[in-house]
């Protein structure tokens, strides 16, 4: 369970959000909505422990992430605007490196993940030679390799075609059905039943 308790964020003397409270239970898929500048990315970074709140705290499994940072990060997969893809490595090598960091190397799973994001035939191309959209697909392929319970995804559908969006939507729903938590922002319309997708709107 993820809890956001009384979180206030002020940037450049402007209040982005104030005394924000909500709880996300295991098995939930949540979309953060709001106008540009409402603080969606800032909120995701605060929840992920990558940014600071002026007031309030984030709790994971009933403990503050400040006191439980190691376990929290072991449960977290965060994908932000910066993909974290290493330009000098191939698409395959990037995912192999990601798996090696988590002591979970599986070559067949890497090939499968790259195929699922539409990069079959591009596995051995250096990431620096891929388009920005293809680099983002490399980053998204980590989702198929992840055993993290909490996914925090900032605009994961950027530069993804309609078929790719459908594939990712199914992945998000499957992760939630297996007891995981997906927290995301997107400017695209999601074709997910309202019973399976909850929305939290900032700026209102």
Swiss-Prot record:
Gene3D superfamilies: P-loop containing nucleotide triphosphate hydrolases (3.40.50.300). Its EC number is 7.6.2.5. It catalyses: heme b(in) + ATP + H2O = heme b(out) + ADP + phosphate + H(+). Keywords: ATP-binding, Cell inner membrane, Cell membrane, Cytochrome c-type biogenesis, Membrane, Nucleotide-binding, Translocase, Transport. GO terms for cellular component: plasma membrane. GO terms for molecular function: ABC-type heme transporter activity; ATP binding; ATP hydrolysis activity. It is found in: Cell inner membrane. One of its GO terms (biological process) is cytochrome complex assembly. ATP binds at residues 34-41. The keyword tRNA processing does not apply. The keyword Cell membrane applies. It is a peripheral membrane protein. Its main location: membrane. It holds the Pfam family ABC_tran. Residues 2-202 form the ABC transporter domain. Part of the ABC transporter complex CcmAB involved in the biogenesis of c-type cytochromes; once thought to export heme, this seems not to be the case, but its exact role is uncertain. Responsible for energy coupling to the transport system. Belongs to the ABC transporter superfamily. CcmA exporter (TC 3.A.1.107) family. The complex is composed of two ATP-binding proteins (CcmA) and two transmembrane proteins (CcmB). This is Cytochrome c biogenesis ATP-binding export protein CcmA. It comes from Aliivibrio fischeri (strain ATCC 700601 / ES114) (Vibrio fischeri).
